[in-house]
Regions:
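Two-component histidine kinase catalytic core, primarily the HATPase_c
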Residues: 37
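Thiotemplate assembly-line natural product biosynthesis machinery
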Residues: 1-20, 71-78
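Phosphopantetheine carrier-protein modules
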Residues: 15-32, 51-59
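C-terminal structural segments of small proteins and small subunits
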Residues: 55-60, 66-76
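Terminal leader/tail segments of proteins
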Residues: 16, 64-65
Length: 78
């Protein structure tokens, strides 16, 4: 899956929740996501994108920015 496609799907996911994200925003510091939000995002990733994230990649650093989340998903998609 292409990086831009993943990023756009993630943007749509957050927009559906009424969240606005600017490039490079720290999603934890801007209250876009919290620990429960990470779990919901992982479920979205598995159910909608068909990408299963290994528990080892579920670190705060991998979910801090939209770009980092997209990189994590792209790496996991093979």
């Amino acid at each position: 899956m292409e990086f831009d496609e993943i990023k756009n799907r993630l943007l749509a996911y957050f927009q559906e929740q009424g969240k606005t994200i600017a490039p490079g925003d720290n999603l934890f510091e801007t209250d876009v996501i919290d620990s429960m939000g990470v779990i919901e995002l992982v479920l979205f990733t598995e159910e909608t994108l068909g990408v299963e994230l290994d528990q080892a990649v579920m670190t705060k650093g991998n979910f801090e920015t939209l770009e980092r989340i997209a990189q994590t998903i792209q790496s996991a998609s093979g």
